[in-house]
């Protein structure tokens, strides 16, 4: 009898051990399933955020024909829709305005010369605007500048050797614009982009708004590969100031230091 009792105890222990191991295997499978679902959810979330970033960022891209257009809180007016805001006075007396219901009506005289002076937190640089080659784009820039649109706006995207980008007064992170789009005025060749070139950021044909970029080197101009961005100006003085801003950029575009346009003014002669 003692032998049979020990045998039953042994069998009981074996059964309990087997049940425990089965439970542990089941629990491990459950944890793996939960972990797999969680990982899948995280991957989906990342993909959604990346896609949202593509949809909302207005970035010029090296080595690519694609860019991403920012959206404001309101739907941007399509290219060709003229807004209701009048041409601001040339003396800078207009109050600041950063949201519009359509592109500007003609406010400049293409036969005249227009110069933009950028006062930044690290110095001043000057750009000669090319109203003959890009009258619509220069008109847009002069219009926004005379409404003080760019005053205090940061250079939110800076890539060393490539571009310094700014012009988002609405959100400040590259996902905003002035509330409208307008048509392209493209150069004939990518060779026209060079150190100091001023061009518009976009998300494809005829999606210009308020954001622009400055090419920081001739090699940076070559990275654009195709003439897909409206070219409307050239830095004539203070390229070293632009390069100071460039120096605080990163390969990913997020600046180590956020520099800003303190004030931008237009001279007409």
For each of these PLM feature ranges, what is it?
Residues 1-269:
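Cyclophilin-like peptidyl-prolyl cis-trans isomerases
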């Amino acid at each position: 009898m003692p032998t049979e009792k020990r045998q039953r105890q042994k069998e009981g222990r074996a059964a309990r051990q087997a049940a425990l191991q089965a439970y542990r295997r089941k629990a491990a499978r459950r944890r793996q399933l939960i972990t797999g679902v969680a990982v899948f959810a995280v991957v989906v979330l990342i993909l959604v955020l990346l896609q949202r970033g593509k949809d909302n960022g207005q970035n010029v891209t090296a080595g690519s024909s694609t860019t991403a257009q920012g959206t404001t809180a309101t739907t941007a007016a399509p290219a060709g829709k003229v807004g209701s805001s009048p041409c601001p006075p040339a003396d800078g007396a207009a109050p600041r305005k950063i949201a519009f219901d359509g592109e500007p009506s003609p406010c400049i005289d293409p036969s005249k010369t227009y110069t933009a002076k950028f006062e930044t937190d690290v110095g001043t640089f000057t750009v000669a605007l090319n109203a003959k080659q890009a009258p619509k784009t220069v008109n847009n820039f002069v219009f926004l500048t005379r409404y003080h649109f760019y005053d205090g706006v940061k250079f939110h995207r800076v890539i060393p050797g490539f571009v310094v980008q700014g012009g988002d007064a609405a959100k400040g992170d590259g996902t905003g614009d002035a509330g409208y789009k307008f048509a392209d005025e493209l150069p004939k060749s990518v060779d026209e982009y060079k150190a100091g070139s001023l061009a518009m950021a976009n998300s494809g044909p005829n999606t210009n708004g308020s954001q622009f970029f400055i090419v920081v080197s001739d090699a940076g101009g070559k990275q654009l590969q195709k003439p897909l961005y409206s070219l409307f100006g050239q830095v004539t003085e203070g390229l070293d100031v632009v390069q100071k801003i460039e120096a605080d950029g990163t390969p990913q575009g997020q600046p180590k230091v956020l520099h800003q346009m303190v004030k931008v003014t237009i001279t007409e002669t």
